[in-house]
Structure formats: C-alpha cells, structure tokens
C-alpha cells in the first residue's frame, strides 16, 4: 500500500478521522517551507497538501491567490517545490505529502519526467485541479506506476457520471469540495455534505476528505462527524499571512493541534 493508503487504513482501524492541512510552498518565505511542513506534522497532520503556486489559480479564493502571487514573486517553481519535499523527507518518512496545483507547470515538465521527479522527491499524491477525470487516464496511470496516488475533486454539482469517472482513475482519497465557488468560501452546510458522501462512496471506494469553508475547530469537528478527513487551507494560509515570521511555525503547529483535538472528538468514521 502507498503511504496515503496506509495512513487511512491506520485511521480507520483506530476509529479516527484524518486531518489534511494545506499550505502554499514558498509562502511566506521559501526558506521556511520545510520548517512549516514539519510544524504541520508535529501539530497532528495525517497528510500534508502542499500547494504548487500558479499564476492563474482559478479554483482558489483571494487568500490563496495572494499566497501564490507572493511565492511566484520569490522565485518558487515546481522544481523548488519538489526540492522542499525531498528535504522534508530527510526527517519525516511517515507523513504523506500531496502536491496540489494546476496542469501547466506539470505539462511544461512533462508527465513522465514529473512522475519520476516526484517519486524521487518522496511525493505521495498529486491533485491537479484542472485535469478532468475523463481525460486523465494516461496521467493517472503514469502516477500510479511511479507509486503516486492521483487524487481528484468532486463537488456538490458532480453528476453520477462524473463521480463514476473519478472512481475509474482516483486512488488514495477523494477531495470533496463542500461548496460551490472558490476556496475559503463560508456558509458550510454539513447536512448537505452528509447527504452527498454516500453517493460518492457507492461509486468511489476511497476515503472522502472534505474541504472548502472549514475555518476553525468547530467547523472541523462538524465535518469530521460525516467525512473521513477534514481538509483545511485558506485559514492556515491566512494565519501565515498575518503571523510574525519568527512565530509562524509555532502558531501554525498550535492551530493544527487545536483542529486535531477537535477532530479526534468526532464520531466514528463514515460508513
């Protein structure tokens, strides 16, 4: 099994839910990314989503857009992000790392070269926001051949056909976007999430992580009651945007620890 699959199997065996925090590589300081990744793990992250900055992050709200702009202005590239993962792996061989980003940087590198470089760096999963599952069979096969889980998004508007298409190519877990719109949106409706997850699981035999709109321990716990994992990004990026540089890692670890405690108080995993 992959590191991601092992992680979710262990969580299920313990009756616990996953915590998947997101930060943008290179923001607020490229030299601090690896330190921040370790802070996430120390705070209780089960999987780390590391954003690859892109100039047109169409699915992201203003907080993550600004984060990408800052990282790009400081010279962050896909190559430097892979180097961050490699340096993280020097100390942490347990915590899975998922790269989340857009197709253009990967296509510039080439899927085969990317798969090899990501494997060698210690990447465990890849979520390419603008790769539709129906057109991703070759890409997903190349990732799986390199031991990397291809992860896909589903949304409240996803049809049964789209869910089935994801089921044909995804592995690791599925990222369910709980709201229409962009990351960081508010007005989380846990009952609608609970209603959608069985439809997903009937067609995709994978854990379901839920993100978009999770901003604190209370919303994280509410989502953990119905999902297999909680994904949180914009709130963490905002925390880093506002934190004093010398306090950023400690504040990040502390906030993630609060989320961890709240999630561990949630009910048993979704059926």
UniProtKB/Swiss-Prot annotation:
GO terms for cellular component: cytosol. It comes from Burkholderia pseudomallei (strain 1106a). It comes from the Bacteria. This is Tryptophan synthase alpha chain. Its EC number is 4.2.1.20. Belongs to the TrpA family. Tetramer of two alpha and two beta chains. It catalyses: (1S,2R)-1-C-(indol-3-yl)glycerol 3-phosphate + L-serine = D-glyceraldehyde 3-phosphate + L-tryptophan + H2O. Keywords: Amino-acid biosynthesis, Aromatic amino acid biosynthesis, Lyase, Tryptophan biosynthesis. It holds the Pfam family Trp_syntA. It is an enzyme of class 4 (lyase). The active site is at 49 (proton acceptor), 60 (proton acceptor). The alpha subunit is responsible for the aldol cleavage of indoleglycerol phosphate to indole and glyceraldehyde 3-phosphate. Gene3D superfamilies: Aldolase class I (3.20.20.70). SUPFAM superfamilies: Ribulose-phoshate binding barrel. GO terms for molecular function: tryptophan synthase activity.
């Amino acid at each position: 099994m992959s590191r991601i699959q092992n992680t979710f199997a262990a969580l299920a065996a313990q009756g616990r839910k996953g915590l998947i925090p997101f930060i943008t590589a290179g923001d607020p300081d490229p030299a601090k990314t690896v330190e921040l990744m370790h802070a996430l793990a120390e705070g209780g992250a089960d999987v780390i989503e590391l954003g690859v900055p892109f100039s047109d992050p169409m699915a992201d709200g203003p907080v993550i857009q600004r984060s990408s702009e800052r990282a790009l202005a400081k010279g962050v590239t896909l190559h430097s992000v892979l180097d961050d993962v490699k340096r993280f792996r020097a100390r942490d061989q347990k915590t899975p790392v998922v790269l989340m980003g857009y197709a253009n940087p990967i296509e510039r590198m080439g899927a085969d070269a990317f798969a090899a470089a990501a494997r060698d760096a210690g990447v465990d999963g890849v979520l390419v926001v603008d790769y539709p599952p129906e057109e991703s069979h070759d890409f997903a096969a190349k990732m799986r051949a390199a031991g990397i889980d291809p992860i896909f998004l589903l949304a409240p508007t996803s049809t049964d056909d789209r869910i089935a298409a994801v089921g044909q190519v995804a592995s690791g877990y599925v990222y369910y976007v709980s709201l229409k719109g962009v990351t960081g949106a508010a007005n989380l409706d846990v009952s609608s999430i609970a209603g959608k997850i069985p439809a997903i699981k009937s067609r995709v035999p994978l854990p379901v992580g839920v993100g978009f709109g999770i901003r604190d321990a209370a919303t994280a716990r509410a989502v953990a009651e119905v999902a297999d994992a909680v994904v949180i990004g914009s709130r963490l990026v905002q925390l880093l945007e506002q934190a004093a540089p010398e306090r950023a890692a400690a504040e990040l670890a502390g906030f993630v620890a609060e989320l961890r405690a709240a999630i561990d108080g949630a009910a048993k995993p979704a059926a």
